[in-house]
Structure formats: structure tokens, C-alpha cells
A protein has these predicted regions:
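Conserved glycine-rich cofactor-binding loop
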Residues: 13-14
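Conserved glycine-rich Rossmann-like NAD(P)H-binding loop of the short-chain dehydrogenase/reductase
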Residues: 29-44
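The beta1-alpha1 cofactor-binding region of Rossmann-like NAD(H)/NADP(H)-dependent oxidoreductases
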Residues: 38, 59-71, 102
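Substrate-binding pocket helix/loop in short-chain dehydrogenase/reductase
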Residues: 96-97, 104-106
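Active-site helix of classical SDR
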Residues: 120, 156
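Residue(s) in the substrate-gating loop at a strand-loop-helix junction
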Residues: 140
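C-terminal helical subdomain
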Residues: 173, 180-181, 196-236
């Protein structure tokens, strides 16, 4: 893969996003980074630099239009046009429905869905103009199923899959690929911080497993499109 290709990854400082940043860098990509916490972003950029990976980024709330525009422009100015966008930022609030507040619902939709819309809207026009680019949306197997306490999360991930399917059909004629990655349970803070969810961390997926999958689909020939891909623990 040419070293001049640039990937912009949202939610980059922890979990799948962090693992993806390093996996892409090791594969020769330049990496654009963003997350809410400025100190976490600075630390990640320093660690990527120490690993010999060219990266740029800034703190951003990717559910806010102005901040999305600012971080996207910053990455383009520092690294060049975005060849791959990985919409990874996400939140999981697992509660029985009657305990789910409107604030919980709005935060889930803003982080998991609104951010995806805003970031895609920001980078897609240039991809279409260049007739080159890939958008990877990190969905979930919860986008096909449900689970107790998951009304907000599963609603958002069903929406991510619907968004991805429709956009894929819309932009493939412009040689832009849209891919939805659907992980099962992954050992990240999203699960560890939810007492309602129980998972054996020794048996579920690791962030690096999902990151390797993302790199794999990105490095397929440009004429090949894996529109959806499920990855799940072998024996959870």
C-alpha cells in the first residue's frame, strides 16, 4: 500500500479506534486521529510518532458540525486527501428501557449516528471528485439483533447498517466503496463499563481483531468491495 494514502479514524484514542490507527500505520498508511479528550489525542499522536507512523489530529466532538469540519480540514492540510474514512466513534449505554433517559438516547444517537453522517458528508465529495475512496462504518452484530438493555444502542446500529447499504448503492458508480463492519462482543470499555452486560474477556474479540479486519478490507483491490462483514468470537 502506498505510504501516501491517508486514513481518518474517529474515536481513535481507545479500543478499536486506537488499534486501527496502529494497524493502519504498520501497513503504511498515514493516520488522521480525533477524539474528545485533548490529552488523550496528544498522547496517541506521540505514541504513533514513536512507532514511526505519520499522523495528525486534534480533539473533536464528531457529533458537532463545526468540529467535524475543523478536524477534517486539519487532517487534509497535514496529510493530504482522505483515502479512507473509518467511522468508529461510538457509545454503548445498556439500561432497561424504562431507565433509559432522553439524554442517554440523544447521546447514543449523536455519537453513533449523527457523527457518522457529519463526517461522511465532510469527506465524501472529494472522494467522489477523485473517484477514489473507502468509507468503513463500524456497525455491530447488534445492528442485526437485539439484546436486553440495548434499545438505544441496537436502534443506532440498525440505522448504521441501513445508512451503509443505501450509501453504498449510491456512490459505487463513482468508484467509492462503503463497507459496514459488524463486530460481535469486543473487549473494550464499551462492554467493561456496562454492569448489565456480561462477557468473558478471555473469549471475546480483541480490538486488534477488528482492526486487522478493517485493514484487510481496505487493502483489497479497488475494484473489489466487501459491502458488509461480520466478525464474531469463535466460542464466546
Amino acid at each position: 500500500m502506498a505510504s501516501t494514502r491517508t486514513a481518518l479514524v474517529t474515536g481513535t484514542t481507545h479500543g478499536i479506534g486506537r488499534a486501527t490507527a496502529f494497524a493502519l500505520g504498520r501497513a503504511g498508511w498515514q493516520v488522521g486521529c480525533c477524539a474528545r479528550n485533548a490529552d488523550d489525542v496528544d498522547l496517541l499522536l506521540a505514541q504513533l510518532a514513536d512507532a514511526g507512523i505519520r499522523a495528525a489530529g486534534r480533539p473533536a466532538d464528531v457529533s458537532e458540525e463545526r468540529e467535524v469540519r475543523t478536524v477534517a480540514h486539519h487532517v487534509v492540510e497535514a496529510l493530504g486527501p482522505v483515502d479512507a474514512l473509518i467511522n468508529n466513534a461510538g457509545v454503548l449505554i445498556a439500561k432497561p428501557f424504562e431507565q433509559l433517559t432522553l439524554a442517554d438516547w440523544d447521546r447514543t444517537m449523536a455519537t453513533n449516528l449523527r457523527s457518522l453522517y457529519l463526517m461522511t458528508r465532510e469527506v465524501l465529495p472529494e472522494m467522489r471528485r477523485r473517484r477514489r475512496g473507502t468509507i468503513v462504518n463500524v456497525a455491530s452484530l447488534a445492528g442485526r439483533n437485539g439484546f436486553v438493555g440495548g434499545t438505544a444502542y441496537t436502534a443506532s446500529k440498525h440505522a448504521v447498517l441501513g445508512f451503509s447499504k443505501s450509501l453504498m448503492l449510491e456512490v459505487r458508480k463513482d468508484d467509492v466503496r462503503v463497507i459496514a463492519i459488524c463486530p460481535g462482543s469486543v473487549d473494550t470499555g464499551l462492554i467493561r463499563d456496562q454492569p448489565l452486560l456480561k462477557a468473558d474477556s478471555t473469549r471475546i474479540l480483541r480490538p486488534e481483531d477488528v482492526a486487522a479486519t478493517i485493514v484487510h478490507v481496505l487493502e483489497l483491490p479497488d475494484h473489489a468491495l466487501v459491502s458488509e462483514l461480520d466478525i464474531r468470537p469463535t466460542n464466546p
